[in-house]
């Protein structure tokens, strides 16, 4: 028995002129459906689930940064991947997040149909909601296959987006320190 998604992938393969019963394609609808579910698994997660009580009391007020978090997502316009990295910083105000949870927050929002601008803001808003810090900074740098494989076909372009909340938005020196520490000036 095929899932609706498997049937749709089978129809898609046939629509482009391929024979879905060909040896190399027989199991492709099943594999593609499984991959698509995985790539969009973020819809079935919540911030509370991802945090899993890993928010801790802490006296630290110094900047916390996790940089070079690898990410991939699907562009909501063409369903093609964009691949890059995310840098997250925040200024604690009595609470910190378990280190791995920051990467999991990035992953939760990246595993949805996205535009990079929204992804960046969702990550920042989630950190803000999780620990109510004095500020949050998120920078995402990514290559978009929708721009590399089709359309203008530019292979080396990188899109950079940022979301700055609290002191990162209000204080240029705080923002500059973050950008310097992640290697962006």
Curated annotation (Swiss-Prot):
- EC assignment: the record states 3.5.4.16
Can you name a GO cellular component term? cytoplasm
Listed binding positions for Zn(2+) are: 75, 78, 146
Pathway given in the UniProt record: Cofactor biosynthesis; 7,8-dihydroneopterin triphosphate biosynthesis; 7,8-dihydroneopterin triphosphate from GTP: step 1/1
Catalytically driven reaction(s): GTP + H2O = 7,8-dihydroneopterin 3'-triphosphate + formate + H(+)
Which leading EC class covers this enzyme?
Answer: hydrolase
The organism's superkingdom is given as: Bacteria
Q: Which Pfam families match?
A: GTP_cyclohydroI
| Family per record | Belongs to the GTP cyclohydrolase I family.
NCBIfam families according to UniProt: folE, PRK09347.1-2, PRK09347.1-3
- Describe the protein's quaternary organization and the partners it interacts with: Toroid-shaped homodecamer, composed of two pentamers of five dimers.
Q: What is this protein called?
A: GTP cyclohydrolase 1
Q: Which organism is it from?
A: Methylococcus capsulatus (strain ATCC 33009 / NCIMB 11132 / Bath)
């Amino acid at each position: 028995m095929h899932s609706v998604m498997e049937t749709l992938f089978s129809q898609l393969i046939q629509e482009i002129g391929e024979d879905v019963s060909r040896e190399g394609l027989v199991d492709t609808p099943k594999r593609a459906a499984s991959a698509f579910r995985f790539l969009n698994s973020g819809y079935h997660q919540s911030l509370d689930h991802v945090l899993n009580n890993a928010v801790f009391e802490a006296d630290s007020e110094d900047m916390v940064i996790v940089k070079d978090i690898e990410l991939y997502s699907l562009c909501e316009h063409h369903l093609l991947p964009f691949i890059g990295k995310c840098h997250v910083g925040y200024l604690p105000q009595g609470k910190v997040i378990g280190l791995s949870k920051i990467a999991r927050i990035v992953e939760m929002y990246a595993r949805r149909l996205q535009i990079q601008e929204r992804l960046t803001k969702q990550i920042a808003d989630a950190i803000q909601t999780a620990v109510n810090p004095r500020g949050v900074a998120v920078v995402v740098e990514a290559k978009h296959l929708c721009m590399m494989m089709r359309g203008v076909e530019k292979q080396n372009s990188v899109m950079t987006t940022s979301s700055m909340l609290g002191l990162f938005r209000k204080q240029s020196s705080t923002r500059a320190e973050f950008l310097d520490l992640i290697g962006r000036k």
